Amino acid sequence: MTSHDPKAVTRRTKVAPTKRMSRFLKHFTVVGDDYHTWNVNYKKWENEEEEEEPAPTSAEGEGNAEGPDAEAGSASTPRQSLDFRSRLRKLFSSHRFQVIIICLVVLDALLVLAELLLDLKIIEPDEQDYAVTAFHYMSFAILVFFMLEIFFKIFVFRLEFFHHKFEILDAFVVVVSFVLDLVLLFKSHHFEALGLLILLRLWRVARIINGIIISVKTRSERQILRLKQINIQLATKIQHLEFSCSEKEQEIERLNKLLKQNGLLGDVN
């Protein structure tokens, strides 16, 4: 009869949901993510659960030591002065920018809902329709900001922008919504595309989900980087302690030999 390792079974139960999550998150990559690395190495989510193995051998330790040194070397390269594209790239990858985008998307969704309630007469509008006009122009201003965001993202990331499906879909929704909203500005009557416009604008709530995922992923990457740095420091400290212990052991052996040679070891014991 074959014996089942309970630890292996537990590991498989942990890996299964992690594997599903990794396959789901790889479709939510955005500009700034390493597209090829994410698609090739997305199994790192499940591999993290399988890293509970014995300590590496000396050869592996040397290999691992080369890795941090290489990373430290690459990180210690002098920073060049940031040009306009580099500053924009840093801005688009920042956590604060994602929070601003989420807030604007929420505000845009609320404005569209308010317009919808006024159009359906659920909320009685004023006689001059000032509220509808104000909501519409505010929503259009937010769309202009999103259009500028897409333009500068394409300017900064170029072909990398088109490697991310979610960015393409989000850009499509923004552009179509912008065109329809622009037509509505010059049309006094409501036309048949108004329902499509509302549907597209409300669909952008998915951007909120994407922003939350990016924020969580960014914080996780920062935490992983911090833990790696702590791990490197602890590994260096362990090496120093092991070297110090070996020196102490050699010194003890040398002193024991001297005691034996002088016949003092028995008296000491």
UniProtKB/Swiss-Prot annotation:
Endpoints of the signal sequence: none
Superkingdom, taxonomy of origin: Eukaryota
Xref: Pfam families: Ion_trans, VGPC1_C
Modifications made to the protein after synthesis: Phosphorylated in vitro by PRKCD. Phosphorylation may enhance channel gating.
Gene3D superfamilies noted in UniProt: 1.20.5.170, Voltage-gated potassium channels. Chain C
Stretches in topological domain Extracellular: 118-134, 187-193
GO CC terms of this entry: apical plasma membrane; membrane; monoatomic ion channel complex; phagocytic vesicle membrane; plasma membrane; sperm flagellum
Cytoplasmic side, ranges: 1-96, 158-165, 215-269
The keyword Coiled coil is assigned to this record: yes
Coiled coil: 221-261
Annotated catalysed reactions: H(+)(in) = H(+)(out)
GO biological process, one term: regulation of intracellular pH
Disordered: region residues: 46-79
UniProt GO molecular function: identical protein binding; protein homodimerization activity; voltage-gated proton channel activity
Modified residues (Phosphoserine): 93
Keywords of the record: Cell membrane, Cell projection, Cilium, Coiled coil, Cytoplasmic vesicle, Flagellum, Hydrogen ion transport, Immunity, Innate immunity, Ion channel, Ion transport, Membrane, Phosphoprotein, Transmembrane, Transmembrane helix, Transport, Voltage-gated channel
Membrane topology recorded in Swiss-Prot or TrEMBL: Multi-pass membrane protein
Modified residues (Phosphothreonine): 29
Organ and tissue specificity: Enriched in immune tissues, such as bone marrow, macrophages and spleen.
Subunit structure: Homodimer; each protomer forms its own proton conduction pathway.
Family according to the record: Belongs to the voltage-gated proton channel (VPC) (TC 1.A.51) family.
Function: Voltage-gated proton-selective channel that conducts outward proton currents in response to intracellular acidification. Lacks a canonical ion-channel pore domain and mediates proton permeability via its voltage sensor domain. Provides for proton efflux that compensates for electron charge generated by NADPH oxidase activity either in the extracellular or phagosomal compartments, thus enabling the production of high levels of bactericidal reactive oxygen species during the respiratory burst.
Protein known as: Voltage-gated hydrogen channel 1
Species per Swiss-Prot/TrEMBL record: Mus musculus (Mouse)
